[in-house]
Regions:
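Hydrophobic secretory-pathway targeting helix
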Residues: 2-29
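Membrane-water interface segments at the C-terminal ends of transmembrane alpha-helices
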Residues: 27-34, 79-82, 148-179, 210-212
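Short, motif-level signal for alpha-helix interfacial/capping segments enriched in acidic residues
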Residues: 14-18, 32, 133-135, 302
């Protein structure tokens, strides 16, 4: 009976996730087309600003663009849904004859690489420091770490990125700004080799540092609060009365239960940052999906914008869905309440 109830619950949640994605995709489709300007006008305006005569600019636009913007909006929407149902994101307006899926596959892995590494470092570091703050709460160590976590969490990531570039790059010259641009050095190809990994980490180093600094504070504070709350539970007191070693209590009784609420936040964080930060990737000129989204917005490349927004939406929605399932599996109290 309980298994059936949980199955129905997760099935309903899955349907809600699909409906949410559909609604957001529809909203995004129409919102993008309500933006001032269209790809054709922006391309011609850019050509004119570069001194190209109007007639020549129009001829270039006619040879490059293969999209009928004169179609009724509803017809374009129906065509979009038909293509989406087949898994076809369409063809980029700006990158002539280039499938959007090919563009996504080219840029998305670099963002996923940065996101995975940075969230792993910040989550593990934040959890460990949060537990340490809870154990030594009200001490000078707790006060210093709490102050650091509060300050660093309040600073926007793009501000930290600009400070790193201006102060450490331009003023102190700790790194060459021009050399670190992009996701790989010229001539380096993706392959399973130490040289490739070193080069990839070198170019991703600054975005990773920014993401770690702007997320670790939240993990520290949430884990500290959750650990303090868990330390006051009856089962922890019973474990102490039974003479169980302090290390075992902290790992098996406190740590395991205190970390559960953080899994929801972790899943949501993964979903949100899959799209990358357009500002961060633009500041460091890191060739991820966020930088590509910025370029697509500027040029009004509708198919690319739609695909990236859809990926971000799906990531956030299904991250929430998976977090809900994960909590149900790991926490017996949630399974009991849902049944």
């Amino acid at each position: 009976m309980m298994k059936k109830i949980l199955t129905n619950y997760f099935f309903i949640r899955f349907l809600r996730a699909l409906v949410t994605i559909f609604v957001v995709a529809t909203f995004t489709f129409f919102l993008i087309r309500l933006m001032p300007g269209n790809p054709l006008d922006i391309f011609i305006a850019t050509q004119l600003s570069q001194g190209v005569p109007l007639q020549e600019a129009q001829e270039r636009a006619a040879s490059l663009f293969h999209i009928d913007l004169s179609k009724p909006l509803l017809v374009q929407y129906v065509d979009y849904l038909k293509n989406l149902a087949r898994g076809d994101f369409g063809v980029s307006i700006i990158s002539t004859n280039t499938p959007v899926s090919k563009i996504i596959l080219r840029f998305l892995p670099w963002t996923l690489f940065v996101v995975t590494v940075s969230l792993f470092i910040s989550f593990v570091g934040g959890v460990l420091l949060g537990v340490l703050m809870a154990i030594y709460r009200n001490s000078w160590l707790d006060q210093i770490l709490s102050f650091f976590a509060s300050i660093i969490s309040a600073i926007p990531n793009y501000v930290i990125a600009m400070l790193i570039v201006v102060y450490f790059g331009v003023k102190l010259k700790w790194f060459n700004i021009a050399e670190i641009r992009g996701s790989l050095s010229p001539g380096v190809r993706p392959e399973f080799s130490l040289y490739f990994l070193k080069d990839a980490f070198y170019h991703a180093m600054l975005p990773i540092i920014v993401y770690v600094l702007t997320t670790i504070g939240s993990w520290m504070l949430v884990m500290k609060s959750s650990t303090i709350s868990t330390l006051g539970e009856d089962y922890v007191e019973v474990a102490k009365a039974r003479g169980i070693k302090q290390a075992n209590i902290m790992i098996n009784y406190v740590g395991r239960n205190a970390i559960l609420p953080l899994f929801v936040s972790l899943a949501i964080s993964i979903g949100f940052v899959v799209g990358g930060s357009p500002l961060i990737e633009s500041i460091f000129v890191y060739q991820g999906i966020g930088l590509k989204l910025s370029d697509a917005i500027v040029t009004r490349d509708y198919p690319v914008m739609q695909a990236i927004f859809l990926i971000i939406t799906a990531s956030v929605v299904f991250a929430n869905f998976l977090a809900d399932i994960l909590l149900g599996v790991l926490d017996p109290r949630i399974r009991t309440s849902r049944s």
